[in-house]
């Protein structure tokens, strides 16, 4: 136990170091030059809008959170309720601080880019690293410190149901914040983007981020609340939920074993080691002699990945060792095999990054095919974009299948869980790449609105083009890890269910229930699969509808301002930017509530609905389990299709900004008919990649978390 205590303290120290590094980076970013007075005024407007939105969003979520906290206390225990509170608060804090920094880094990045491309890259990436390392550090601290409190201060055994229920509740707290942040932020950002583009670019013929567009500040606010705060909450949740699910599986599989304590500390130690490798990896991001921005970012990612192999070895040595740990379902589990599973997780991450970049990167076949289709019109652009979005699901799915089968062969379901933990271990670096995107996007907007030299806009555009790809890449990573993480949660559900059923004398609700069969000949299983499969589609449809409504409101507002203030187009009158921001804030908060509750309530409806119809608890649990699989499988394909397809549409549009040469050798420039067709495609792709697709992510996991909590609640019933 002494060694276990030392490892736990070391894990907590790694989390603290990550937060300290983020604080140092914040001081460094805020010390940079803010540029001209005009630049600072624009940045202040973006900052005010983002803060107003996030404050209102979290105030709304807090009401839901208080109700859930009281329910968790009443139905489970105070410890479980506190776990929920820790997960929710830390998830919110991560997003808030990340956005707080990004809305201050944007103007500083624009100023740095006016001096050199390398300076702009360094500042934008450093601000992204702050969000990334806060996500990893606070998620690791949340789980490890609460586990320390439960097992050391309160004296519970590591596999005690109180510990497991409390940690699962922590994951639920993070999930609830995540789904609201992802969906609300996505509705805001894409409502502004779609509305601003349709009237500004297509109708008025003015460029992106033109200060004459009344929606331009709202668009820049949206980049921060969607891509920074939203992604931070999403990956915080995936990180926390995956670590918790792996610990729960460890507690189930190794219950009563001497290796139990070390097995439960193993995923925490992997994440602790990988936090350190992510910190070291940030120092490798430097612009090389070839001037490749993506190359500079990939240097950091590759360094983190290679160092993480060493980190995995350290985690093995300090916890489970290299020999045999125990036997699970007749399969011998060794430390060496678990180490290889961790390596497979890192390889899966690398492959998903490469595949996503191929489908969304400029000058790659998929993006060029959409740009080429734009030459023949709006309809062909949309058709080809949909074709690319569907095609983009195949390779990631094959990689994920390979990861599942290979890790299962090596170490069973616990091996798969360790692979996902290793994937999430490097989340600090991955989120840094993502949060880099909104900062560079905002920097370009500020440069345009402040009327800086065209060379500055050229530098920020180069950073922004890479930022678009990194945002797409990180979404691919987030979806892949979410799909695998949800599979681990499903394994926890099925094994938890088997545990309760086998111990009916302790848990009366499960006594005399009979065996639960997930056999496909069971009609309740098929019904559950179909019901679960519809959730990502219905959820995605609701999200797209919400963006359409918000975007429509922005279109009306921008048209109204152009109509009532004709001086806007000549520069004699100033647009009312705050009106569009306020309108979108209200719309996003209003539109996010019902879709967000769908994946939370669905498992409860499935269980009690089937129980009412069949009168059989076993049939109800089988239908619920099958519905979780339906959500995971369809959710994975819907999310990958939407995010990769949307990213490809976006970069196809960007191809025209520097001039796109078609198959016949004709060059099409910005403002051409082909460019207008590409803007239409991007208008469809925007809510695909930034609202519906990413929000399916937390929806997949929250259904599984709710199912786990439902088991815990039923187990507490007399």
Curated annotation (Swiss-Prot):
The annotated site for Determinant of potassium independence falls at 471
User: Where in the cell does this protein reside?
Assistant: Cell inner membrane
Q: Which reaction does it catalyse?
A: diphosphate + H2O + H(+)(in) = 2 phosphate + 2 H(+)(out)
Q: For site (Important for ion transport), what residue positions does UniProt give?
A: 182, 227, 234, 690, 701
Residue numbers binding Mg(2+) 2: 220, 223, 441
Binding of substrate, residues: 190, 689
Q: Which EC number applies?
A: 7.1.3.1
Binding residues for Ca(2+): 650, 682, 686
Cofactor(s) recorded in Swiss-Prot or TrEMBL: Mg(2+)
Q: Return the InterPro entries for the record.
A: PPase-energised_H-pump (IPR004131)
Q: Where are the transmembrane segments?
A: 6-26, 61-81, 83-103, 112-132, 133-153, 168-188, 235-255, 265-285, 300-320, 335-355, 385-405, 413-433, 472-492, 524-544, 593-613, 620-640, 695-715
Q: What job does this protein perform?
A: Proton pump that utilizes the energy of pyrophosphate hydrolysis as the driving force for proton movement across the membrane. Generates a proton motive force.
Outline the subunit composition: Homodimer.
The protein's name: K(+)-insensitive pyrophosphate-energized proton pump
């Amino acid at each position: 136990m002494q060694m276990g205590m030392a490892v736990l303290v070391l894990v907590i120290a790694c989390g603290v170091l990550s937060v300290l590094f983020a604080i140092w980076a914040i001081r460094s970013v805020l010390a940079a030059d803010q540029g001209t007075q005009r630049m600072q005024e624009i940045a202040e407007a973006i900052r005010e809008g983002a803060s107003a939105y996030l404050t209102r969003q979290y105030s709304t979520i807090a009401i839901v959170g208080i109700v859930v906290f009281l329910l968790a206390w009443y139905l489970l225990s105070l410890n479980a309720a506190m776990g929920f509170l820790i997960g929710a608060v830390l998830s919110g804090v991560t997003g808030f601080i990340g956005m707080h920094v990004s809305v201050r880094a944007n103007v500083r990045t624009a100023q740095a880019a006016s001096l050199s491309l390398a300076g702009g890259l360094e500042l934008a990436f450093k601000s992204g690293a702050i969000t990334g390392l806060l996500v990893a550090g606070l998620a690791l601290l949340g789980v490890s410190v609460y586990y320390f409190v439960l097992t050391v201060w309160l004296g519970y055994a590591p596999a005690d149901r109180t510990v497991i229920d409390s940690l699962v509740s922590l994951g639920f707290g993070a999930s609830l914040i995540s789904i609201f942040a992802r969906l609300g932020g996505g509705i805001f950002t894409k409502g502004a983007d779609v509305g601003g583009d349709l009237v500004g670019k297509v109708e008025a013929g003015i460029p992106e981020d033109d200060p004459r567009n009344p929606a331009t500040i709202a668009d820049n606010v949206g980049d921060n609340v969607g891509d920074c705060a939203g992604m931070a909450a999403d990956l915080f949740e995936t990180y926390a939920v995956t670590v918790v699910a792996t610990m729960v599986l460890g507690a189930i599989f190794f219950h009563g074993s001497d290796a139990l304590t070390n097995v439960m500390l193993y995923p925490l130690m992997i994440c602790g080691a990988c936090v350190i490798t992510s910190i070291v990896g940030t120092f490798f991001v430097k612009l090389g002699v070839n001037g490749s921005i993506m190359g500079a970012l990939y240097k950091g990612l590759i360094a983190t990945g290679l160092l993480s192999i060493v980190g995995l070895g350290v985690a093995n040595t300090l916890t489970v060792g290299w020999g045999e740990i125990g036997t699970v379902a007749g399969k011998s589990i060794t430390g060496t095999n678990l180490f290889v599973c961790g390596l497979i997780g890192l390889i899966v991450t690398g492959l998903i990054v490469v595949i996503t970049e191929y489908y969304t990167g400029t000058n790659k076949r998929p993006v060029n095919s959409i740009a080429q289709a734009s030459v023949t019109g709006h309809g062909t652009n949309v058709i080809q974009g949909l074709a690319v979005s569907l095609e983009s699901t195949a390779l990631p799915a094959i990689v994920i299948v390979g990861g599942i089968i290979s890790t299962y062969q090596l170490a069973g379901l616990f091996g798969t869980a360790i692979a996902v933990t290793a994937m999430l271990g490097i989340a600090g670096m991955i989120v840094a790449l993502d949060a880099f995107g909104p900062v560079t996007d905002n920097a370009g907007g500020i440069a345009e609105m402040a009327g800086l030299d065209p060379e500055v806009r050229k530098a920020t555009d180069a950073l922004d083009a890479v930022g678009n790809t990194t945002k797409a890449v990180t979404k691919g990573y987030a979806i892949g890890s979410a799909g695998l993480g949800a599979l681990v949660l499903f394994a926890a559900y099925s094994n938890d269910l088997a545990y309760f059923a086998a111990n009916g004398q302790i848990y009366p609700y499960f006594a005399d229930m009979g065996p639960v069969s997930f056999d496909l000949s069971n009609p309740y299983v098929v019904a559950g699969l179909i019901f679960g499969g519809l959730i990502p589609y219905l959820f995605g449809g609701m999200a797209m509808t919400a963006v359409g409504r918000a975007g429509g409101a922005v279109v009306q507002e921008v048209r109204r301002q152009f109509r009532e203030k004709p001086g806007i187009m000549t520069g004699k009158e100033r647009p009312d930017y705050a009106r569009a921001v306020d309108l979108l804030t209200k719309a996003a908060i209003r539109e996010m509530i019902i879709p967000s509750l769908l994946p939370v309530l669905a498992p409860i409806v499935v269980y009690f609905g089937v129980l009412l119809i069949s009168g059989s608890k076993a049939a109800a649990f089988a239908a619920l389990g099958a519905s979780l699989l339906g959500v995971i499988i369809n959710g994975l394909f819907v999310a990958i299709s939407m995010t990769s397809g949307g990213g490809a549409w976006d970069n196809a549009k960007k191809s025209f900004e520097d001039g796109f040469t078609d198959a016949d050798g004709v060059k099409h420039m910005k403002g051409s008919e082909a460019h207008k067709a590409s803007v239409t495609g991007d208008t469809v792709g925007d809510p695909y990649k930034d609202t519906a697709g990413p929000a399916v992510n937390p929806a997949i996991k929250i259904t599984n978390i709710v199912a786990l909590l439902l088991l815990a609640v039923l187990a507490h019933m007399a």
